[in-house]
Amino acid sequence: MISDTTIRKLVDYISLNACSVNSSGLYNGKSGISLALFETAKCLQDTEIEDKAFSLFQESLIRKTNDYGFENGMSGIGYVLIYLITNKLIDADFEDLFGDQCEAIIKHFENIDKQPDKLLVSYKIIYFLFVLDKLQKQDERIYSIIEKIFQGLELYLSLQFFDWKNIYYINSKDYVLQMYEAYLKLVDFCNYKYFSKSLMDSYVTLYSEGRIASSLVRGYYLRSIITKNNMVGFNDVIRDHIRYGQKNINPAILFLDQKINLTGIIENADENCVKIQRIEMDLSEESLERIKRMVRPNCIHVGYQYGLARYLGFCTNKKFPLL
């Protein structure tokens, strides 16, 4: 990947710019940046970087927020805390540091099945709830919320696929497919066993009729899910998704986060190609200025979601969470 010298340049640049980041959340805030710095400190065995990471994360923990969401709110910070504790990056007691906030999050989402508008914008909280459930198995409310969100997503997607062929269909099909991709990723992440088989059948039928294009990402997660659950009958669809989806990749127009997200998927794809080598070359860039130019415009360029913190974490730990 990249040299230790370039990693340290990234650390200095991110640390310098982190002070101007106002959010405390995971995607665009200080907790996401601290996560990358903690991983880097472990990789380089550098206590100075660890101190920077700890300071940033402390700021995230003490800052008051009414946002309970995963991307930029309280549950994203909770996810980072659990990750740091379970991976022994810090020595801390979750209940002492985050017990009150955790209870507030659970109460906020306990009746999410009665708020469908909130459900479609809050589904990523499952990432937090899943790791929380492994930490606190005695709280039945946690799994209940996970189940309600999955069922809500499945109902929404089933209705969209049912109307897909209607000439008066007005919703954005790109958005619906993005939601389905996010749903598959969540099912795979949680090893969720009660996912809707009929929803998968509806998707496969639409694909077989030529109404949905191939997608490497959807093919990858479909393959992972059916393999884990010993399902049969989807091999042709998955093979075509991966084969043709890979052909649709154009490394020249991909942003930094897209290249990072594709690496693990491409490595597991059946067919290797020159495009993969191009992406790997881009992610091995030693020039900080060129790396910065790969970040999406109009985003928090040092952040975890799209920016340099994601890249730094990825470079220092191949198992860095890409959520």
Regions flagged by a language model, labelled:
Residues 1-3, 35-50, 89-94, 183-186, ...:
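An acidic intrinsically disordered interaction segment
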Residues 1-5, 9, 131-155, 167, ...:
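Terminal, non-catalytic domain-edge segments
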Residues 16-23, 62-67, 108-114, 156-167, ...:
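Helix-loop junctions that connect tandem helical modules in alpha-solenoid scaffolds
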Residues 51, 55-152:
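Extended ligand-binding groove/face enriched in aromatic
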Residues 9-17, 52-61, 100-108, 148-159, ...:
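Alpha-helical solenoid scaffolds in eukaryotic proteins
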Residues 33, 37, 77-80, 125-128, ...:
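Hydrophobic anchor position in alpha-helical repeat solenoids
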Residues 2-71:
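Internal amphipathic alpha-helical repeat/solenoid segments
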Residues 22-30, 66-74, 114-122, 168-176, ...:
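Helix-start/N-cap signature of alpha-helical segments
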